[in-house]
Amino acid sequence: MKYEKERREILSAALDMLQYSLISLSGGNIALRTDEGSFLITPSAMRYETMLPEDVVLLDAEGRVLEGCRRPSSDTKALLYLFRQRSEINALIHTHQPYATAVGLVEDELPGCLVTVLDACGPCVPVAPFTISSDEGMGVLAAEYAGESLAVILRSHGVITMGRNLSEALEAAIYLEEAARTYLAARALEIGRAHV
């Protein structure tokens, strides 16, 4: 099996995503560009707690399976599109994290309200319009709206974070959720104060 170390890193990141409540059950996915230009991606509809290194699927740049017996994530086309658009990015994480997703329902961007999100994602995290996830369209909108940011919120869907490596993409997702929770709390206090 090729890339066993990288596959184990993906599984570890997925368990961290569960620990930080960024995903539930089999939702979301992780994709990693290899040093040979192929891609590792988590399988579709499989719970992360039961996933083994061999369950992570190895794909070529066109999305063809090179190694693995599982079906790759339904978001594969979108994620491969993002990799093509952002050559400096080697890791993508897609989550359904609740607070950042909530921001995407009511705002067009999450301002850089905490230093951690500023460092991990950029000055703001834009919100892309809703689109179905099973085609390249989600990747097209995510790339367009993200610009140079290392994260984008997908309206009514979730989040995609990016990094030069898996650690950066994971930190972006965690700090984004922290900032979204803080931002929504501040907005609630502001609204509450207006009604006193």
PLM regions: where:
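Glycine-rich flexible loops
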Residues: M1-R193
